[in-house]
Amino acid sequence: PSKSGPRPSKSGPRPSKSGPRPSKSGPRPSKSGPRPEKCGSAMRKAEAEKCAKRKGRFSASKCRCTSAGKPSKSEPRTERPTTCVESSESDEVTPTPEVPTTCVDSSESRESPVCDDAMRKSEGEKCANLGGKFNAENCKCTPEPVTEGPTTCVESSEGDDSLVCDDEMRRSEAEKCTKIGGKFDSETCKCTSEPVTEGPTTCLESSESDEVTTKKPCDCTCAPECKRRKMIIDVLLKYFYRDVYDKNCCKENCKCDGAKFPECEESNSKQSGMFDILAKLFKPQGGDFEAGSVEVDGKKLTSEKKEKFGKALQDAVKGLEDVLNS
């Protein structure tokens, strides 16, 4: 056969390399599901309104609505504050980053709330009304320790006896102290009771007899501590039996805070010794005593006078005990 004979044409029909092949750009199984439709301005607005109704958070760049309770991983968690006032739900959502109208935590790892100027002003005023100290940097109000004027002088501590008063309290306590006749120490804020000298106002007379002089000298009762004498009979004899009263004892017992009792000085009684008279005359049980054992103004007491004398003593002691125990 001739070499020039017809050959199969190279340009004949062959399987086309450019024939139909699976398109690389054709539909493939989507790993993440159907993509959201790109948003235009109208779509954003519609989606934002839907999101607002569900109280979610709308992302304009992703055209997505995130539930308020479930923030996306890429977004910082924003919890609604409990103390700062919430902004209204009807605020329009814009694609621009939101400026907080409330004090909200900027992230979970940061405790300091972030405030805008309006919020700082509002929170600052609230804090001032509460008497606190406002920190504009972290938008927090720290309660200031409230220093109330004392209504009483209180001890500064359990182990400290000194009282701490302000000037107003010192004036008040000083006035109270003056009214009760005390002496006020402004340094310690304490009132010390001044010894009260109650001078005798009247010299009462008891019944007199021809044998026993019973003129009553003035009362030696002065300050409260003077009322509670160890020997009730000291007062008893001063009350009822001037002429049998030992004037030295009178001076000693009437020495209340320097008070002077002329009756004690003027007594012309014998130096008989009050306690001797007491031992002979007075018995708490009201027992008898021997006739003639006691002389008053040089006279011996008769049985009748003796009985009256004993009864008067007992009645007087009872009255004095009632006074001293009241």
Swiss-Prot record:
Could you tell me the keywords of this UniProt record? Answer: Repeat, Secreted
Where is the sequence biased in composition, kind Low complexity?
A: 1-33, 93-102
Q: Where is the composition biased (Basic and acidic residues)?
A: 34-51, 107-119
Compartments (UniProt record): Secreted
Q: Which cysteines are joined by disulfide bonds?
A: none
* Tissue note: Salivary gland.
Gene Ontology terms, cellular component aspect?
Answer: extracellular region
Q: Where mainly located? A: secreted
* Chain positions covered by the region annotation Disordered: 1-119
Classify the source by domain of life. Answer: Eukaryota
The protein's job, in short, is: Used by the larvae to construct a supramolecular structure, the larval tube.
Q: What's the protein called, per UniProt?
A: Balbiani ring protein 1
